[in-house]
């Protein structure tokens, strides 16, 4: 099988219901910020569940193989929450498990974790959210723009505490809040977003030196 170097139509593996719309939107926003306007994820992302489920024997491989077999995509991207797991060590584990599948189908397979959860991205974007949706009555602090939100557990709860007039609901608000994100600001402060941007650049590139991303090894 001929390897398609520069991928444009990734099949997405996502965690839950809200992610099926929010993750493709975020990927498109990040790609467009890099000028990659023709990178458009396939419709109907595959819900694969959380990391503990994917860690079970054969589960990760089953989902990645299913995504590789879809005729509407030229690549695969997994985007799930990392919660309290180490994103680097989990990336090493997962890329090792899917490498053979990527080579068998000659498709690029990228893995991206949101540390700690998808809503953590919104905590890095509180100012932008407050400007786009002022009616929610945002409570902002002076250190919001410099704080490392990836160390904070319970991002959904923190998000709710920041709004006086609104209650966050994942399936209703994920896409809405993604629309407020400034990608350049986000990638300069949030390592998960920067990793996603680099993954998208790798996916789009003509390089076929590696069919899995990130290209991590132990040690």
Language model segments and positions:
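C-terminal accessory helical subdomains adjacent to catalytic cores in phosphodiester-
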Residues: 2-9, 20-49, 57-219
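Short hydrophobic beta-strand that contains or immediately precedes a catalytic carboxylate
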Residues: 12-15
